[in-house]
Amino acid sequence: MLTRKQNELLLFIHNRIKETGVSPSFDEMKGALQLASKSGVHRLITALEERGFIRRLAHRARALEVLKLPESAAAHETPAIPKGDLGANVVRGNFAKPEPDARENTVDIPMLGRIAAGVPISAIQHETDRFPVPADMVMGGEHFGLEVKGDSMIEAGIMDGDTVLIRRCQSAETGDIVVALIDDEEATLKRLRKKGGSVALEAANPEYETRIFPPDRVKVQGRLVGLIRRYH
């Protein structure tokens, strides 16, 4: 049984995808349901996902798929929810262990431990494992993976437990999501903003404050180029 707000949000998402092929943004969902904050939208989406009504897909920030509707709403649906093209913002993912022939188009990437999307944790660890990714995701440069710990980047579509694919680099453009090393001891995943003579590390969750540092305290370790989410 869904609450009234959960039901309203589910139908709003479903109708928007049917009309435009694109999932609504957090701002649009907040406005449609007249919620006070985006964190309220996140809680509703999490509840719908836990109940099996929607799922969040990898690679894109605005990537929601409606799996089913409440019986009262589904009875009026003709045709049924499409299972084919989900729109330009959705990439279907299949992260099961690939068959031998499928691995011909994959590349093994080192897993370097966990990265904080929240309060910074200890600096990046040594290689703990390797995992396959599509070769076209890592064309050029050196790449590595990190498991996300925390919820400070949820509005960028990055959730606790996701694996982020990072291209190693020492600089980034303002607005890029980066792995930043603070004072050579704390690693965190944040959006980089260059403000005058300072560097801002910006969360994608209103519950976290932007942190501002002089440039010599922050070293860019890499830039986000992909994301993998596994469904169990």
Curated annotation (Swiss-Prot):
Belongs to the peptidase S24 family. It comes from Maricaulis maris (strain MCS10). CDD domains: S24_LexA-like (cd06529). The active site is at S152, K190. One of its GO terms (molecular function) is serine-type endopeptidase activity. Pfam families: LexA_DNA_bind (PF01726), Peptidase_S24 (PF00717). Keywords: Autocatalytic cleavage, DNA damage, DNA repair, DNA replication, DNA-binding, Hydrolase, Repressor, SOS response, Transcription, Transcription regulation. GO terms for biological process: DNA repair; DNA replication; negative regulation of DNA-templated transcription; proteolysis; SOS response. This is LexA repressor. InterPro entries: LexA, LexA-like, LexA/Signal_pep-like_sf, LexA_DNA-bd_dom, LexA_repressor, Peptidase_S24_LexA, Peptidase_S24_S26A/B/C, WH-like_DNA-bd_sf. Coiled coil: none annotated. Residues 26-46 bind DNA. Homodimer. It is an enzyme of class 3 (hydrolase). The record marks A117, G118 as: Cleavage. Represses a number of genes involved in the response to DNA damage (SOS response), including recA and lexA. In the presence of single-stranded DNA, RecA interacts with LexA causing an autocatalytic cleavage which disrupts the DNA-binding part of LexA, leading to derepression of the SOS regulon and eventually DNA repair. It catalyses: Hydrolysis of Ala-|-Gly bond in repressor LexA. HAMAP family: LexA. Its EC number is 3.4.21.88.
